[in-house]
Swiss-Prot record:
GO CC annotation: nucleosome; nucleus
Organism expressing this protein natively: Zea mays (Maize)
Biological classification of the source: Eukaryota, Viridiplantae, Streptophyta, Embryophyta, Tracheophyta
GO terms for MF: DNA binding; protein heterodimerization activity; structural constituent of chromatin
Protein name per Swiss-Prot or TrEMBL: Histone H2B.2
S-S pairs: none
Main location: nucleus
Quaternary assembly: The nucleosome is a histone octamer containing two molecules each of H2A, H2B, H3 and H4 assembled in one H3-H4 heterotetramer and two H2A-H2B heterodimers. The octamer wraps approximately 147 bp of DNA.
Record note on modification: Can be acetylated to form H2BK6ac and H2BK33ac.
Residues bearing the modification N6-acetyllysine: 7, 34
Pfam families per record: Histone
Function: Core component of nucleosome. Nucleosomes wrap and compact DNA into chromatin, limiting DNA accessibility to the cellular machineries which require DNA as a template. Histones thereby play a central role in transcription regulation, DNA repair, DNA replication and chromosomal stability. DNA accessibility is regulated via a complex set of post-translational modifications of histones, also called histone code, and nucleosome remodeling.
Similarity comment text for this entry: Belongs to the histone H2B family.
Stretches for region Disordered: 1-57
Annotated crosslink Glycyl lysine isopeptide (Lys-Gly) (interchain with G-Cter in ubiquitin) location: 146
Length: 150
């Protein structure tokens, strides 16, 4: 957060260049130093603004697109509200967190450093109940087979 604090004064001080110009010796050296970071920070602000936006978009990963695609496959004529979409997104994040935690436990129990499809499959069987687990395992196996064959 300190770099942001440095950028804000650098952005404010070029606007105050006229009063700084009156202070010739003291103002010139800091001006030169301020101009270089201001130029750099202006370049970085533009770059970071773009990068920051990209990072912002990357950090906000949602499953909304995929939920919508599945909804349209199952019920093409039905829509979904933004609140319902948010609930579905939270539900998927929660399930994936539970599956990842269970897979990590299984890998630790077996003293293996890698989570493989086997750990994921076992964690699905442990986390999801009965028939839902069977369907999830069959769909997952089908997806992995399709992925490896192509």
């Amino acid at each position: 957060m300190a770099p942001k604090a440095e950028k804000k004064p650098a952005a404010k001080k070029p606007a105050e260049e006229e009063p700084a110009a009156e202070k010739a010796p003291a103002g010139k050296k800091p001006k030169a130093e301020k101009r270089v970071p201001a130029g750099k920070s202006a370049g970085k602000e533009g770059g970071e603004g773009k990068r920051g936006r990209k990072k912002g978009k990357k950090s906000v990963e949602t499953y909304k697109i995929y939920i919508f695609k599945v909804l349209k496959q199952v019920h093409p004529d039905i829509g979904i509200s933004s609140k319902a979409m948010s609930i579905m997104n939270s539900f998927i994040n929660d399930i994936f967190e539970k599956l990842a935690a269970e897979a990590a436990k299984l890998a630790r129990y077996n003293k293996k450093p890698t989570i493989t499809s086997r750990e994921i499959q076992t964690s699905v069987r442990l986390v999801l109940p009965g028939e839902l687990a069977k369907h999830a395992v069959s769909e997952g196996t089908k997806a992995v087979t399709k992925f490896t064959s192509s």
